[in-house]
Design a protein with these regions (language model features):
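Terminal, non-catalytic domain-edge segments
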Residues: 1-29, 212, 275, 324-335, ...
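Well-ordered alpha-helical scaffold segments within catalytic/enzyme domains
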Residues: 1-9, 58-69, 100-113, 154-166, ...
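Residue-level recognition of alpha-helical structural elements
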Residues: 11, 49, 72, 89, ...
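Long, well-ordered core segments of solenoidal/helical folds
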Residues: 14-43, 68-87, 117-139, 172-189, ...
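Solvent-exposed loop and edge beta-strand segments that line ligand/cofactor-binding
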Residues: 35-58, 81-97, 137-151, 189-204, ...
């Protein structure tokens, strides 16, 4: 099935129009900063950082690169300017040096003049990783040490694509992979006695990063065994079978299935299993991943719809998952995608500052301009629907 055939043309055009309108309202770094100031008054969480991929100008550079409007370079410059006041002294993907490198690498595909800066940024990233002393004692590990959002899994995703591959980059990637192999062994990613299953902070994200590296030929001793152990554990702690296969947010679990989302629970776990299946050629595992996501999307269609429209914990994240699975051959995801896309497009409200509001897990409703939990991420998702192909930025959500 071609990606272009996943949505009716009229719906794809509507998605593109909404994405363009969001892009217009975030057309300059000054507008984005003003939106961030407004959003900060609506929440008790501090989230906006100029150089951040998740909630900053780096993420908005991606927005404008993919909307086809020539504003991306202005946001790149704004992101680098922000580092003068708040230097990126940590390597993470969504909030650190790896994220800025990811955005700059994407923009550099159109703007080769940024390539020298990208090389320097990758060297900075490598040095930060080499200088990082991640804990290796059971019980001393926090999710930001290993996870996709802040830790070694997300950093691995970016280092796998770094070019040129210098000796420092090689050493840094080796350190990340070896740490993830250790974390994956015997449940070392437990935090306060709980093992997270999901993509953003749990086993699925670790597995996806290790699988992406494996597929690219970047391997260390024990990596395949770690993939097998993570996969076996995820399948063992899942509940039900076939289309009823689902996962709690953590093990042990306080309640049932995690809310439908990219970040936690069934959606992210299915994506992690799909990444492993594609890296190892395991068609049986691919079928189980397809069935698990199909079941989740069926439950969403029956009314279990996330309140937020955003990528992280909302509807846009489910659209990303459905598109990804459909493009890899899932008939269930292909059937579900138009309905999800239509719901996301219909939710847009031009009377709102950014057309969409994030419903935070704390209960706040926020006009967030960012990528992971805001309007920029929704616009990027809608642009992918409009163009009918998998955009490169999805790699930060679904490593491959």
């Amino acid at each position: 099935m071609s990606d272009a055939a996943l949505l009716p043309p009229g719906l794809a055009a509507r998605a593109g129009a909404v994405a363009d309108l969001i892009g217009e309202r975030l057309a300059t770094p000054a507008r984005a900063d003003a939106a961030a100031v407004r959003a900060a008054r609506q929440t008790d969480m501090s989230f906006w950082s100029g150089a951040s991929l998740s909630e900053g100008h780096a993420g908005l550079a991606l927005l404008h690169r993919h909307t086809g409007v020539d504003h991306a370079s202005a946001f790149v410059r704004a992101a680098f300017s922000a580092t003068r006041e708040n230097p990126l002294d940590h390597p993470g993907l969504f909030d650190g040096t790896a994220g800025l490198a990811f955005a700059l690498q994407d923009v550099s595909r159109d703007e080769s003049r940024f390539l020298p800066s990208l090389g320097k940024l990758h060297e900075q990233l490598a040095r930060q990783v080499i200088a990082t002393d991640w804990p290796r004692l059971p019980g001393s590990v926090a999710d930001h040490h290993y996870d996709l959002v802040y830790g070694a899994a997300g950093i691995t995703v970016q280092l796998c694509s770094a070019s040129p591959v210098t000796s420092a980059v090689e050493e840094a990637l080796d350190r990340c992979l070896r740490y993830l192999v250790w974390v994956a062994t015997a449940g070392h990613w437990a935090v306060h006695g709980r093992l997270d299953t999901g993509m953003s902070h749990g086993a699925a994200g670790i597995a996806a990063a290790l699988a992406a590296a494996w597929r690219r030929g970047r391997r260390v001793p024990g990596q395949r065994a770690a993939l097998d152990e993570l996969t076996a554990w995820l399948l063992a702690v899942g509940r039900g079978g076939g289309h009823g296969l689902r996962w709690p947010r953590t093990v042990p679990a306080d309640d049932g299935e995690a809310a439908p989302a990219w970040c936690h629970g069934t959606g992210g776990v299915a994506a992690g299993l799909l990444a492993v299946a594609r890296a190892t050629g395991d068609r049986g595992l691919e079928d189980r991943a397809f069935a698990a996501l199909d079941g989740l999307l069926d439950r969403v269609a029956a009314g279990d719809v996330p309140r937020s429209p955003t990528v992280c914990h909302g509807l846009a994240g489910l659209v990303v998952l459905a598109h990804e699975f459909a493009s890899h051959g899932s008939q269930g995801a292909a059937r579900a995608l138009p309905g999800l896309a239509r719901r996301l497009v219909d939710t847009a409200d031009p009377d709102l500052p950014l057309l969409y509001r994030d419903h935070e897990t704390t209960g706040h409703i926020v006009d967030n301009p960012g990528l992971l939990t805001g309007a920029a991420g929704i616009a990027l998702t809608l642009r992918a629907l409009a163009t009918g192909h998998r955009p490169g930025w999805w790699t930060v959500l679904l490593p491959q």
